[in-house]
UniProtKB/Swiss-Prot annotation:
GO terms for cellular component: cytosol; peroxisomal membrane; peroxisome; plasmodesma. The gene is PEX2. Pathway: Protein modification; protein ubiquitination. Keywords: Membrane, Metal-binding, Peroxisome, Peroxisome biogenesis, Protein transport, Transferase, Transmembrane, Transmembrane helix, Transport, Ubl conjugation pathway, Zinc, Zinc-finger. It comes from Arabidopsis thaliana. It holds the Pfam family Pex2_Pex12. This is Peroxisome biogenesis protein 2. The lineage of its organism: Eukaryota, Viridiplantae, Streptophyta, Embryophyta, Tracheophyta. It comes from the Eukaryota.
Amino acid sequence: MTPSTPADDAWIRSYQRLLPESQSLLASRRSVIPVAISRVNQFDAARLDVEMSAMLKEQLVKVFTLMKPGMLFQYEPELDAFLEFLIWRFSIWVDKPTPGNALMNLRYRDERGVVAQHLGKVRTGLEGPGLTSPQKIWYCVASVGGQYLFSRLQSFSAFRRWGDSEQRPLARRLWTLVQRIEGIYKAASFLNLLSFLYTGRYRNLIEKALKARLVYRSPHMNRSVSFEYMNRQLVWNEFSEMLLLLLPLLNSSAVKNILSPFAKDKSSSTKEDTVTCPICQVDPAIPFIALPCQHRYCYYCIRTRCASAASFRCLRCNEPVVAIQREGVSSGK
């Protein structure tokens, strides 16, 4: 008895019958790969963004230095909101990382859109779509608009003195409501901070509400660790501390006397140089001359130098000054 020969398309029918089952098995096994993002990098990125905003604000304020003093103070919330909007517009809105995130190799990923996809390809756990347009808009509204409204509300309530006891009941209730909302927000932020330290996800409440998680842009990033700046800073700090220790011990007049012969030739001195006091560089109000070189000084300048140094030398000719006398007087010290 010979076995029956299978039909030519039997393997095709078997493949089509087993394909849904195999795909379901693969999909069940290919869940989202857990990936750990450095908490330090995320905090550093936030700090860099804050410093970038401060630098932009400092440069923008310099434009209005010649205008009325204090004019920008009343518009400071609008200025901060404008700068934050610019950073959002040219980074998150166009699917680019913020300056801090770019330096830390981070980007925003929509956690709700992370699904098992690209079957058969090698995955690192960093795949996933970026933020959607509604997420970007809500991020701007919450971060830029929310911060601006709260800052304006605080300044307005303080100016209107809502917290005073003699205010109207409505103002008091509004002030109490604002304080309660602020307290609830701070408590929620603290709980979110504890959750972030434990899980490494969502630095603030805005990211948590929008499911916008920071992940690495590239799975492999070359970290070029350089201690050149740190070494330079340490050397400069030690050098400056040494100078601060030694400078009070040095005699400035003695150093000038040592360096004056090398500064310029004696023949290059003009008539104006011989008239002015070589110490304060002005015309002496009470002119005195140094003996025996006969060079003019202010009385206070040369008297102070002679009292502070036992062997004071003339700053013009480097000759020892043995006595001083008022100009036009035959004798005196």
